[in-house]
Amino acid sequence: MNLPIKSNAASKEKLLTLLALKAYKNGNFTLSSGNKSNHYVNCKPVSLSGNGLLLLSNMMLENVEPDSLAVAGLTLGADPLVCGVALAATYAGRKLDALIVRKEPKGYGTASWLEGPLPPAGSVITVLEDVVTTGRSSLKAVNQLQNAGYRVNRIISIVDRQEGGAFEIKKAGLDLVSLFVLDEVYEKFKNT
């Protein structure tokens, strides 16, 4: 099977325009970190649209480590991303499963933190994230995956807000690959 769309400069520009028009807001906001900001990025209107998810999935897949057996991320922002990337991988002829990391363990049954087809212990998993601010959400997902016996080396985000998250992720010994930084989204917003 072939990917329905190949990533290239035109598709990256199209995705940036979608983020600027549908995900970016300018005003006075309190972020999940508690910090105040004039910039707010909510990627869900893009990641939950068919066209947006298609663009995101293919671009993120290009950055998933070759030895990863799964992609995972903290619910809710990463849910469409992990599913989209796993599907894009299938179209590309690659086996890559999707895992969702709960914010809290399941309150009944297995009390699991992870949902999805679990790969063997010791497997490499790439973490997906919509927006990195402080890095806490990404690192929470990494921590739960490592506690379950998996290896995580890389986090892929849609947008790095450039507020210290990349530093915290690097300090934890992980790579961060971001499709865009906040400055790029803001510049596109101003010029669209």
From Swiss-Prot:
E.C. number(s) listed in UniProt = 2.4.2.10
Q: What is the required cofactor set for this protein?
A: Mg(2+)
Q: Which Gene3D superfamilies match?
A: 3.40.50.2020
Sites binding orotate sit at T133, R161
Its pathway is: Pyrimidine metabolism; UMP biosynthesis via de novo pathway; UMP from orotate: step 1/2
Identify the SUPFAM superfamilies for this entry: PRTase-like (SSF53271)
- What reaction does this enzyme carry out catalytically? orotidine 5'-phosphate + diphosphate = orotate + 5-phospho-alpha-D-ribose 1-diphosphate
Q: Which UniProt keywords apply?
A: Glycosyltransferase, Magnesium, Pyrimidine biosynthesis, Transferase
Q: List the disulfide bonds.
A: none
Q: Name one GO biological process term.
A: 'de novo' UMP biosynthetic process
Among InterPro entries, the record links this protein to: OPRT, Or_phspho_trans_dom, PRibTrfase_dom, PRTase-like
> CDD domains given for it?
PRTases_typeI (cd06223)
EC primary class = transferase
Q: Give one GO molecular function term.
A: magnesium ion binding
| Ligand binding (5-phospho-alpha-D-ribose 1-diphosphate) | R102, K103, K106, E129, D130, V131, V132, T133, T134, G135, R136, S137
Which NCBIfam families does this UniProt record tie to the protein? pyrE (TIGR00336)
The text of the family note is: Belongs to the purine/pyrimidine phosphoribosyltransferase family. PyrE subfamily.
PANTHER family to which the protein is assigned, alphabetical: OROTATE PHOSPHORIBOSYLTRANSFERASE, URIDINE 5'-MONOPHOSPHATE SYNTHASE
Describe the subunit structure.
Homodimer.
Biological function: Catalyzes the transfer of a ribosyl phosphate group from 5-phosphoribose 1-diphosphate to orotate, leading to the formation of orotidine monophosphate (OMP).
Q: Indicate what this protein is called per its UniProt record.
A: Orotate phosphoribosyltransferase
